[in-house]
């Protein structure tokens, strides 16, 4: 089965769906919103072609569930807020939003939410139905999605860490697995494995920047949020805990060691310096803003479906309940690729052990995601200067 067929979130509205387990990502979007408003302000002041009539934006790696339209809402509100601050008396521009993700993404669940979303947008923002048009653009952002110089603003949150493929070179010429008993490029991975993952990320992100520069208008903007490398004080990350859970099943005899050794997740958390270096070497974009921030990976446990903080009852401070919440989030993201390789029957056991390991980390006050926000502007052509 092709990687793109299994590298997607759990669809639907069930307990294991991404739609039901994405409160952490809501916190990330809330953290990024002030930067989004700043980025939109710079975009509108740049006076790009046709921007006062129709602003074309896209969310790259939109997934499904409530967060998808939460991102759209934040973009629309930012545009209207900045225009009001600028005292722009021209008629509001139409906003055309493209939601992009892999073909197996559950776009239908998003479409079902659109009627109520449009009504809410009209009630809260005064935007008449038809002034914000939302469409899907299925496909991989590792390839071309839009016509040349057609887009004003591109947004992506928690997607760029996913690679276009498992790096080559993880098996030696003698057929020996280089990344033995590991599922990604961890701190314990051999240097050749770490280099293979970095090389693949460099290739993918360079291609991403080049293609996006072709799709954006001159001086168009791009706002990216992704996981980046943490430090020793963060404790084991969720991929480490997932790796530990699968190793436990191997030790207990529930999985064959060869099955683990042949599994590598196409994901890479780059360092800030690695990301900056790739942007500078590719050369199409100027870095306008860069910030890192940490969030506990159980932070979303205290957030309800409307991104409001729940009451602080003893239940919500219990590390086992919080760990189970983190396990549900990870399952909603990685179940398709895990089930494809290990089989569906073992999935509950993997995440039961994951939750056990996560509870130990949470009890110690550790367990953080290190996140990066980077705002980019496409460099103007010489003829535009």
UniProtKB/Swiss-Prot annotation:
GO MF: metal ion binding; methyltransferase activity
Classification via InterPro entries: MeTrfase_7, MeTrfase_capping, SAM-dependent_MTases_sf
Similarity section: Belongs to the methyltransferase superfamily. Type-7 methyltransferase family.
Annotated residues for binding of Mg(2+): 179, 261, 263-264
Position of the signal peptide: none
Role of this protein: May be involved in the biosynthesis of caffeine.
Gene3D superfamilies linked to this entry: Methyltransferase, alpha-helical capping domain, Vaccinia Virus protein VP39
Name of the protein in its database record: Probable caffeine synthase 3
Tissues expressing this chain: Expressed in roots, stems, young and old leaves.
Cofactor: Mg(2+)
Organism whose genome encodes this protein: Coffea arabica (Arabian coffee)
GO biological process terms on file: alkaloid metabolic process; methylation
Note on cofactor: Binds 1 Mg(2+) ion per subunit.
């Amino acid at each position: 089965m092709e990687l793109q067929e299994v590298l997607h979130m759990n669809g639907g509205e069930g307990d294991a769906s991404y739609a039901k387990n994405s409160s952490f990502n809501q916190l990330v979007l809330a953290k990024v919103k002030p930067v989004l408003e700043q980025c939109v302000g710079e975009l509108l002041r740049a006076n790009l072609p046709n921007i006062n009539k129709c602003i074309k934006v896209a969310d790259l790696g939109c997934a499904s569930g409530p967060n998808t339209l939460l991102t759209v809402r934040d973009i629309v509100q930012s545009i209207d807020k900045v225009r009001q601050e600028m005292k722009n008396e021209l008629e509001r521009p139409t906003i055309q939003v493209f939601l992009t993700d892999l073909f197996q993404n559950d776009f239908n669940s998003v479409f079902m939410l659109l009627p109520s979303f449009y009504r809410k947008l009209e009630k809260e923002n005064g935007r008449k139905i038809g002034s914000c048009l939302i469409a899907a653009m299925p496909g991989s952002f590792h390839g071309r999605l839009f016509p040349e110089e057609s887009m004003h603003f591109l947004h992506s949150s928690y997607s760029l860490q996913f690679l276009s493929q498992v790096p080559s070179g993880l098996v030696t010429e003698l057929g020996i697995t280089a990344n033995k008993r590991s599922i990604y490029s961890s701190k314990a991975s051999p240097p050749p494995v770490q280099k293979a993952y970095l090389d693949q990320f460099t290739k993918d992100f360079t291609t991403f920047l080049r293609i996006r520069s072709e799709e954006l208008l001159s001086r168009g903007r791009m706002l990216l949020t992704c996981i980046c490398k943490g430090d020793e004080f963060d404790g084991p990350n969720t991929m480490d805990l997932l790796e530990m859970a699968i190793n436990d099943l191997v030790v207990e005899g529930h999985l064959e060691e060869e099955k683990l050794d042949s599994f590598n997740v196409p994901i890479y958390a780059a360092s800030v310096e690695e990301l900056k270096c790739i942007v500078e070497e590719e050369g199409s974009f100027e870095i306008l803003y860069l910030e890192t921030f940490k969030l506990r990976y159980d932070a979303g446990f205290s957030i309800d479906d409307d991104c409001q903080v729940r009451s602080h009852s003893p239940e919500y401070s219990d590390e086992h309940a919080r760990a189970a919440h983190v396990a549900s989030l990870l399952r909603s993201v990685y179940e398709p690729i895990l089930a494809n390789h290990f089989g569906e029957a073992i999935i509950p056991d993997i995440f039961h052990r994951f939750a056990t390991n996560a509870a130990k980390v949470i009890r110690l006050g550790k367990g953080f995601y290190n996140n990066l926000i980077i705002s980019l502007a496409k460099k103007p052509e010489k003829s535009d200067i």
